[in-house]
């Protein structure tokens, strides 16, 4: 059995904390460790911030989409998507310290953080169509989902 949640919200920076807390609340039913929960919250924060700042270039007309799937074996799958400007070169964007917004004091560590905290990460992006992140984490001692 699996459990799924879908969420969409305006691409406003104040909605980043809403997304982070909502995803964390949903995941708690698997009883993750505090470290695992913190890592997932950080990843959601980084991904949503990237969508808002880079994908939509802070244009609040955009929408961020999140899907969370919890599997009975303790696997958490996240899909975070925007319909923004896309990433021209994903490999370059994933390099530590790479940023397209140095004037906004961006550290360029978002993808590096996501790769370190998740077991799997896949990025699909098309210029002028948007970016989708697929992320997966295996929780260590999670509870089975209730039937």
Curated annotation (Swiss-Prot):
Pfam families reported in the protein's UniProt record: HATPase_c_2 (PF13581)
GO biological process: asexual sporulation; negative regulation of sporulation resulting in formation of a cellular spore; sporulation resulting in formation of a cellular spore
Superkingdom assignment: Bacteria
GO molecular function per UniProt: ATP binding; protein serine kinase activity; protein serine/threonine kinase activity; sigma factor antagonist activity
Protein's job: Binds to sigma F and blocks its ability to form an RNA polymerase holoenzyme (E-sigma F). Phosphorylates SpoIIAA on a serine residue. This phosphorylation may enable SpoIIAA to act as an anti-anti-sigma factor that counteracts SpoIIAB and thus releases sigma F from inhibition.
Family classification: Belongs to the anti-sigma-factor family.
InterPro entries noted in UniProt: Anti-sigma-factor_SerPK, Anti-sigma_F, HATPase_C_sf
Species whose genome carries this gene: Priestia megaterium (Bacillus megaterium)
Catalysis: reaction(s): L-seryl-[protein] + ATP = O-phospho-L-seryl-[protein] + ADP + H(+); L-threonyl-[protein] + ATP = O-phospho-L-threonyl-[protein] + ADP + H(+)
SUPFAM superfamilies associated with the record: ATPase domain of HSP90 chaperone/DNA topoisomerase II/histidine kinase
The protein's name: Anti-sigma F factor
PANTHER family: ANTI-SIGMA-F FACTOR RSBW, ANTI-SIGMA-F FACTOR RSBW-RELATED
The EC number(s) this enzyme carries: 2.7.11.1
Keywords: ATP-binding, Kinase, Nucleotide-binding, Serine/threonine-protein kinase, Sporulation, Transferase
């Amino acid at each position: 059995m699996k459990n799924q949640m879908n969420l969409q919200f305006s691409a406003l920076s104040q909605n980043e904390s809403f997304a982070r807390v909502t995803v964390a609340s949903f995941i708690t039913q698997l009883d993750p460790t505090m470290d695992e929960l913190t890592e997932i919250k950080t990843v959601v924060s980084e991904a949503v911030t990237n969508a808002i700042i880079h994908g939509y270039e802070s244009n609040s007309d955009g929408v961020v989409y999140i899907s969370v799937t919890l599997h009975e074996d303790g696997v958490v799958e996240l899909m975070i998507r925007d319909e923004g400007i896309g990433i021209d070169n994903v490999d370059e964007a994933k390099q530590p310290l790479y940023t397209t917004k140095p004037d906004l004091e961006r550290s360029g560590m978002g993808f590096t953080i996501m790769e370190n905290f998740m077991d799997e990460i896949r990025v699909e992006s098309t210029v002028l169509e948007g970016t989708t992140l697929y992320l997966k984490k295996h929780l260590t001692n999670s509870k089975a989902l209730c039937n």
